[in-house]
């Protein structure tokens, strides 16, 4: 999804 975009400063991949 597009939640961690603002949740975490680092990219998931």
UniProtKB/Swiss-Prot annotation:
Cysteine pairs bridged by disulfides in the record: none
Keywords: Carbohydrate metabolism, Chitin degradation, Glycosidase, Hydrolase, Hydroxylation, Plant defense, Polysaccharide degradation
GO-annotated molecular function: endochitinase activity
Coiled-coil region(s): none
Keyword Plastid: no
EC number: 3.2.1.14
Family per record: Belongs to the glycosyl hydrolase 19 family. Chitinase class I subfamily.
Function comment: Defense against chitin-containing fungal pathogens.
Name of protein: Endochitinase 2
Organism: Capsicum annuum var. annuum
């Amino acid at each position: 999804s597009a939640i961690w975009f603002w949740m975490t400063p680092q990219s998931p991949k």
